[in-house]
C-alpha cells in the first residue's frame, strides 16, 4: 500500500558510499556563516574515524570515492543522491558549484547495480540533506537548496511512498535540525524553527512518530542503523561537542551508541548524515 513502506527493514544497510575530503575544502567550501577556519588535517582525521565506524566497526562495505580539488564540498555525498531500496535518485544540487559532484556518485551507484534516475529538469533543485526518509514516507525540506520541482521529481521516483514538503526557514537543510534516531523515532532540535517543522510533519503524516528532543539543533542530526547481530545502532555527536544533547541520547537504552566527532566539518555546515550515502543491497539468492 502506498505510503506504508517496509518499516521492519528500516535502518538496514550493507554498503556506504563516502568521499575523501579535498584540501580545497578549507578555503573554498560553501558555508552559511563566516566563522572559524577549518583545520583540514583534523577534519580528515575525524572523517577517517567516521568511515572506520561504518566499515570496521559496523561491517558495512565502504565504497570510498577520491577527493576532487575542483569540488571543495565533495565530501558531503548525501546531497547528490537519495537511495531507497534498489533505486537511486541522482539529484540536482541547489548550489551550482556542486553540480559536477553527481558524476562520480552516479558511476559508483551504477557499479552497485542500482536503478538510476537522474534529475534532468533545469528548474529542479534538490539536496539530499533536505530529504528525511522515515521508513514509511518522505519529508522534503523546501529550503535555499531544494525547491518544489525537486520534491515532485522525488515523489515521481519513489511512487510507493507518500511525500510531503516542509518549509525550512532557518538552517541550511531539513536535516540540519532533525533526523531518524530509530524505526519510529524522530530526533528533533529545540529551536522554534525545528519545533515548527516537526509540527508540520506531524500534521502531514497519517502516522504517529515518537520524538526525541535534544537541546542543540545540530546534534539532532544522527545516523540510525539496524545491523544484524548488533541491533539498533546510533551514531551521534560526542559529549565533548554537545554535552546536553549527548545526555539525551544516552537515555536510549536499546541502542548501541557510538559518539562521533564532526566539529571541523561542522564549520562548513557538515553534519553526520552529510558524509555518507547508505545502501541496503539485497543479497543475491
From Swiss-Prot:
Keyword rRNA-binding attributed: no
pH dependence: Optimum pH is 8.5.
Keyword Transmembrane: no
Swiss-Prot/TrEMBL catalytic activity: N(omega),N(omega)-dimethyl-L-arginine + H2O = dimethylamine + L-citrulline; N(omega)-methyl-L-arginine + H2O = L-citrulline + methylamine
GO cellular component, one term: cytosol
Modified residues (N-acetylalanine): 2
Name of the top EC class for this enzyme: hydrolase
Expression (tissue specificity): Detected in brain, liver, kidney and pancreas, and at low levels in skeletal muscle.
EC number: 3.5.3.18
Function description: Hydrolyzes N(G),N(G)-dimethyl-L-arginine (ADMA) and N(G)-monomethyl-L-arginine (MMA) which act as inhibitors of NOS. Has therefore a role in the regulation of nitric oxide generation.
Protein name, per record: N(G),N(G)-dimethylarginine dimethylaminohydrolase 1
Organism this protein belongs to: Homo sapiens (Human)
Amino acid at each position: 500500500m502506498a505510503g506504508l513502506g517496509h518499516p521492519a527493514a528500516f535502518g538496514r544497510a550493507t554498503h556506504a558510499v563516502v568521499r575523501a575530503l579535498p584540501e580545497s575544502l578549507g578555503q573554498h567550501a560553501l558555508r552559511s556563516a563566516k566563522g572559524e577556519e577549518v583545520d583540514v588535517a583534523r577534519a580528515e582525521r575525524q572523517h577517517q574515524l567516521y568511515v572506520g565506524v561504518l566499515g570496521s566497526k559496523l561491517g558495512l562495505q565502504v565504497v570510498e570515492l577520491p577527493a576532487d580539488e575542483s569540488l571543495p564540498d565533495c565530501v558531503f555525498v548525501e546531497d547528490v543522491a537519495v537511495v531507497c531500496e534498489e533505486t537511486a535518485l541522482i539529484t540536482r544540487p541547489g548550489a551550482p558549484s556542486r553540480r559536477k559532484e553527481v558524476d562520480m556518485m552516479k558511476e559508483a551507484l551504477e557499479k552497485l547495480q542500482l536503478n538510476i534516475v537522474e534529475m534532468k529538469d533545469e528548474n529542479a533543485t534538490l539536496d539530499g540533506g533536505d530529504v528525511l526518509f522515515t521508513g514509511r514516507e518522505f519529508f522534503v525540506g523546501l529550503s535555499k537548496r531544494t525547491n518544489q520541482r525537486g520534491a515532485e521529481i522525488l515523489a515521481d521516483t519513489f511512487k510507493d511512498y507518500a511525500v510531503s514538503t516542509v518549509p525550512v526557514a532557518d538552517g541550511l537543510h531539513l536535516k540540519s535540525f532533525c533526523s531518524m534516531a530509530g524505526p519510529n523515532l524522530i530526533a528533533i532540535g529545540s529551536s522554534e524553527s525545528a519545533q515548527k517543522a516537526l509540527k508540520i510533519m506531524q500534521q502531514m503524516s497519517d502516522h504517529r512518530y515518537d520524538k526525541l528532543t535534544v537541546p542543540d539543533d545540530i546534534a539532532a542530526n544522527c545516523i540510525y542503523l539496524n545491523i544484524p547481530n548488533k541491533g539498533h545502532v546510533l551514531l551521534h555527536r560526542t559529549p565533548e561537542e554537545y554535552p546536553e544533547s549527548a545526555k539525551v541520547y544516552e537515555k536510549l537504552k536499546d541502542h548501541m551508541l557510538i559518539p562521533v566527532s564532526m566539529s571541523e566539518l561542522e564549520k562548513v555546515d557538515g553534519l553526520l548524515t552529510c558524509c555518507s550515502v547508505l545502501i541496503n543491497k539485497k543479497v543475491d539468492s
